[in-house]
Amino acid sequence: MNERRTLKKNSDFRRLYSRGKSAVNPYMVVYCRRNRTGENRLGYTVSTKLGGAVVRNRVRRRLREIYRLREPELRQGWDIVVVARMKCVKGEYKKMDASFFSACQALGLTKEAAE
């Protein structure tokens, strides 16, 4: 993922938490809000409550890969934050992928939802 397409600032995350739309499922919480760029910017939150550094990095890598594979199906021009929940630690990849996509559909981020 490109460096400029990643949310890094605390203010960006807080703006999404307070003013963005959200979708919740057992695996993750997805927040989104329109941005002024023509591309999506993505941020991940994986709490230390989920486990040590190895576990958190594994969850982060899985979430990044899920987004990378689903990106062609998503509309552009959004800030998206994915907050991992405890089920992500031992959850199956396919279920994580399905829950991410269903959250995106609920938020209207998919191209088919826009049509």
Which residues does each predicted region cover?
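Positively charged, solvent-exposed patches that mediate nucleic-acid binding
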Residues: 1-115
